[in-house]
Design a protein with these regions (language model features):
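Active-site neighborhoods and metal-handling regions in enzymes and metal-associated proteins
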Residues: 1-479
Length: 479
């Protein structure tokens, strides 16, 4: 057994011991963190720590060992809505979407985990098929949206299975070498790029609350908060936000809950000039404002897709009048003003220039006429050019453009068969393909510039060996 597989087994058994100690029959572990973000810092990558699966979405479900004796010894099959019959072998499973069907089987220990596509079977369906009535399934409410929690609760209760709020995330309890949280400094996003100063956005939000007769709205989506305040940060890989939460009131006041480490005292005056007066509190006190809102019978608006179940359950415990719907920042954030539209235009021109330079370089490198049209000579000459070299070269052309900040996501740089993995990440691969390992090269990449964000995907001929079937498939995709 490989070292990584052995670690997966040790960690899974440690989780099962926690379940047994807490008299919980099963657990569902979500990929997301308390902000319900797919882009996780290293200290929030719980499924990766537990199973080695590094995708940006998914769930892991485990059934307690002391419960195994109650389970049927006969093979269990689940028939889904498409009339597909799925065999449920193991008592540990990972559920992913179609982007990761190939990747998950390469990364996890298949001796202990079954892997399933979420379109075929979901964790709650798997548990309902395997567990007897009266069982208890634990989840960390912080890592599930409120709407997902309600859907889980309804599905499990139909099978007479209870959903339990775990006091602590079981992965956190066994993660002894867990990385420290990342708290980067708040950065001001200048009005010349955002097109609408923060005080105006705040005024618009307060007007909306008054029009709808809400006392307050709870905002737990860092992207919405950073948009509202016209700030940026570096707490997330390739996502320029700071982790924080907020309560906005109909009278225009804001309570911003954020770690002290995020704000440089020397910059606080400049920050207040930029966003207007704001009451700042340590994020660890966020539950206090929820209890206050609950006990005061306030009318509170929240987005059940971007606010986690812990937050809304806490509001429910008192007398808060909760209304649910699309977050009040979502639509204004999506409707770009003329400054933002002009910025995106400029960003895409810069990015287009960078990618044209990259493809010109690649065309010259892979021109067979340089190698006497000899495929063996070609392979020897370009053998040191792998997927990492290509990705880094593409970024180097972007870096020379004005106002470049960073990649907008991990570059998917894939030669040959690696392109079959929808979210292939060369930085996590055991072996990198090189030019000559396949005729096709696919690069999906993008960048953050001060004036806009880009995302471009291209598949190009980068070596000998193209077949009629490849041409046909490429043409069908292009169409």
């Amino acid at each position: 057994m490989a070292d990584t597989d052995r670690l997966s087994l040790i960690r899974m058994n440690a989780i099962l011991s926690i379940l047994e100690k807490n008299h919980v029959d099963a657990v569902i572990i979500a990929h997301d963190d308390e902000y319900l973000s797919e882009e996780l810092s290293a200290d929030k990558q719980r499924i990766k720590y537990l199973t080695d699966f590094s995708g940006s979405a998914g769930y892991c479900a485990l059934i307690s060992k002391n419960h195994e004796e109650k389970l049927s010894k006969d093979p269990i099959f689940f028939r889904n809505k498409n009339e597909e019959e799925i065999k449920l072998d193991k008592n540990a499973a990972i559920f992913v979407d179609g982007r990761y069907s190939v990747q998950v089987r390469k990364q996890v220990n298949l001796e202990i985990y079954d892997t399933f596509n979420l379109s075929a079977i979901r964790p709650e369906q798997w548990l309902c098929a395997k567990l007897p009535r009266g069982s208890k399934v634990g989840i960390d409410l912080n890592c599930f949206s409120y709407s997902h929690y309600l859907q889980l609760k309804e599905s499990l209760e139909k099978a007479d299975i209870n959903i339990i709020d775990l006091e602590h995330n079981p992965v956190d309890e066994i993660w002894n070498d867990r990385p420290a949280p990342i708290h980067t400094k708040v950065e001001i996003f200048p009005d010349e790029y955002n097109g609408c100063p923060s005080p105006q956005k705040r005024h618009n939000l307060a007007c909306t609350l008054r029009e709808k007769n809400y006392d307050a709205t709870v905002i737990c989506d860092p992207e919405s908060i950073c948009w509202l305040l016209n700030i940026r940060g570096r707490d997330r890989h390739c996502l320029p936000v700071v982790n924080c939460r907020m309560v906005a009131y109909s009278n225009g006041t804001l309570e911003w809950y954020i770690s002290d480490d995020h704000i440089d005292p020397n910059d606080q005056k400049q920050l207040e000039t930029h966003i207007g007066h704001i009451d700042i509190f340590p994020e660890k006190r966020f539950d206090e404002v929820l209890e206050r809102l609950s006990n005061s019978s306030s009318s509170v608006y929240a987005d059940p897709e971007t606010v986690n179940a812990h937050v809304l359950r806490l509001l429910e415990t008192g007398g808060a009048k909760i209304s649910l719907g699309l977050g009040l920042c979502q639509l204004p954030k999506a409707c770009k003003n003329h400054v933002e539209i002009a910025g995106e235009y400029k960003a895409h021109i810069k990015d287009g220039i960078a990618m044209c330079r990259f493809f010109a370089w690649l065309d010259e490198l892979t021109d067979l006429s340089q190698y006497e049209n000899d495929e063996e000579v070609f392979s020897r000459r370009v053998n040191d050019t792998d997927e990492a070299v290509l990705a880094q070269r593409a970024e180097s052309f972007r870096k020379v453009e004005s106002d470049y900040i960073e990649p907008s996501f991990d570059t998917i740089s894939a030669i040959g068969t690696n392109a079959a993995m929808v979210h292939y990440n060369y930085t996590e691969a055991d072996y990198l393909n090189k030019l000559g390992d396949g005729p096709l090269y696919m690069i999906d990449s993008g960048a953050h510039y001060l004036d806009g964000t880009t995302d471009i995907t291209r598949t190009v001929l980068a070596g000998p060996g193209i077949t009629d079937e490849m041409r046909r498939m490429y043409t069908l995709v292009l169409k």
